[in-house]
Amino acid sequence: MRCNGMNVGARQVLQAVFASLVVGSSWCLAGSFPPSEKIFPATTRAWLSVPDTRGLQERFDRTPYGQLVADPTMKAFVDGFRDQLSKNGKQRLAKLGLTLEDLGKVPGGEVAAAAIEATPGVLSTVLLVDTTGHEAEAKALVDRIAERLLERKATKITVPNAPPQLTVYQLPPEQDGRADAPARDRRVAFALAPAALVVGDDAVQVGQAFAVLAQGRQDSLTTNPSFTTALGRCGKEIPATAAPIRWFIDPLGFAKAYQASNPPREKRKGPDYVAILGRQGFDAVKGIGGVVAFDHAGHSLRHHTLVHAPALPGREPFGPERFDLAARMLRFPDTEGIAPPAWAPRELAGWTALQWDLQTAFTSIETLFDDVVGEKGTFDDVIASLKEDPDGPQIDLQKDMVAALGKRVTLLSHHVEPIGTDSERIVIAIEATDPQRVAATVAKTMAADSDMQKIQIGTHEAWELIDRSMAIPQIEVETPGGAVAHADRHEGDDDSAHRRRQRLREKEEKLLPHSAVTVAHGHLLIASHRDILERVLANPGGADSLAAAADYKSTAAELARLFPGKAAVRSFGREDETIKPTYELLRQGSMPKSKSVFGQLLNGILGDGKPGTVREQKIDGSTLPEFESVRRYFGTTCLGMETTEEGWYMAGAALPRSDRKPEVARSPEAPAGR
């Protein structure tokens, strides 16, 4: 039996909710409501809150970012970008009968959104807006929502005992694109009070949120230990007067619910990465949350984040067995003295150093590797083939390489001029406790690889990957629920291990098609291009070192205030040098062709997923002004992380630009592509 399009079970639940609404609706005369974290349930998987929308806007406008947006030379681009953002936003908000413009007119206080999994595998979206002082605008918005829903052929549902504040619409069923899939049931509900508006795609959740606006609920998000730990740690770092953005997510919980609520339009073969992470112990990460503020304490932007991942019961919080299975690789011991090495060039765009227990990571990766490939024993097979295959390097990877590495991993980033699709450069430097052994292992491995050629860079022996293809490299990126094909299985094929290694190598070549490798300065150096490796090896240190740069020193001093003791990560970046490659590619309309790691990731996320295709650029950058005219708006950034009993605490800041002159990006001495 159905009642106006709603089944009896759902109607009974709604009636129960509405009964509580009738009792609790009298609160509305009193005005504002408790913080949204006391309104939304403990089953909230993701949450975003802006307690002071006006204050946030004012603070943003005072930052260099706000000044950039207001720069007259940026007007054409900003207007076009806002139009596009509005269109993209409408595709999502339209499901609730809203637009981005709507959200800018009605808030008088907090605006919060939540993704709620009240029923396993069903993700609901609820938006809560404090409309204090904007009651007329809120009423007009509700009328517009109703008009838009009716234009989409929605039907208003009438349920007995429902208070007049809540309205429910049933939308026509929507096919998800699969011929064998049933049409999706869609509803929109909204409730309006004198000082609040609640909108969502689940009438029960909207009704419950509205019903508890007076006092909050006992089973609220604040009863989630991960939420209270993360927001408790980070919230005390930035006062409410700074108009912060607050956020929280249960990463695996959200991913699983999103996956179940949004099945792929096409059936995909291969591993389910969300399920794999859960199986491999990464569900030890219970939640991630933090706060972000603009124009606070002399910083253009300030952020604090806690990854809540306490040790499993009975485990040592800082030991290698803190977690199970592959999650044991998440071991980042704190240390003192993290700073740029003398050989890090002064003009770099960015530097990041991470303390990582690589030995534990290596011994933990086996089960994850096998799970992703889809065949138990594959990792051991690959390791054995490296040692025993007569055509291979015949090395013991654990003994000859991993055991000779330290715990410091450093990333250097920069770019070369003129800016093109292959301008960005990176160097990954891994500390070597026994450089001679690492160098010998690298030489033996490279000599057995026909795709690597030996080169000489000054007094250093290095190896460079021979680029045999001009094809645009791509990274396969999967959204939650997505998958890539498993490695082919060749039952009875003696060459199966070789085939697996070859496939892995092909992926490496796509990622870094011009890579060069050497051992120098007590590190294994892996460079994206030969020219950046040459620059690092030739750097004399001293005044030419990043550590000697004035902007690094001032930014490092700010980071030291955030992390005065030991840390597992320290990072420095120059916003202008970091942003410039992407900025110029946007101006050229060439971002989809970018060969940088970031560009490939972006293209993988935004592309159609079909191999060999180049996505259409989503943002029109043709109206952007010359970069030099806006460089002054970009300053420096810093980031730190420390390992705690609760997980990992991170904090960082963006500093306004000083009077420093930009470090000049060095043009490659070799032809493009090196």
What do these predicted ranges mean?
Residues 30-183, 228-289, 306-422, 439, ...:
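Structural boundary/hinge residues at secondary-structure and domain interfaces
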